[in-house]
Amino acid sequence: MVRHELGKWNLNELIKNPNRAIVDKKLANIESTAKKFEKIKKSLNPNISSKKFLRLLHDIENIMEKSSLIGGYASLRYSENTQSDEATSFLTRVTKFGSDIENRLLFFDLWWKIQVDENNARRLIKSAGQLSEYLRFKRLLAKYSLSEPEEKIINTLDVTGATALVKLYDKITNAYIYVVTVDGKKRTMNREQLTTLVRSKKAKTREAAVSYTHLTLPTKA
């Protein structure tokens, strides 16, 4: 049976020379910035100046960009080897962290969608430049928004619910080696390779992909 060698990606563009101390420091900095941003909650007013409003938007953008970089790193590191307990644990930790950050910033999102009156909304959108369409879209979602506590629960459940199940599914199915007969020849492949065949232009190849003869766990060296 063919052995599949795991490759390793260079993720230095996301986090250079990553180690626990560096990641912890980055997460702490993001959390600190988010906590600082939270302090504006009580002072938010629909009559806010366009300049200050735009600055707040860029503050959120900066926080989410930094959080997304670490999230992307964790996700790609996990995809590199879904059988790694270390990578799985790290992704879970970072995903939960990202959810916590979203919950800290949620008040601003709901304030913009629900509490800002139409006249002030038009005024602020007009001076928002590239972010104007984003702000208009947010306003369209107002009627679907829940209370802040309810929205926070949904964000948390996204991490511990469906996302956790998908991760478990990936961990199980990516461990298998599939034996498939294609063009009269038996081939062994992993789930990603099998998925490619499922999307083949040839009907017989697609049929073979979903009718694999059996699957086994790979033999450890």
Functional labels for PLM-detected ranges:
Residues M1-L215:
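A well-structured
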Residues T216-A221:
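A short, hydrophobic C-terminal helix/tail in secreted or cell-surface proteins
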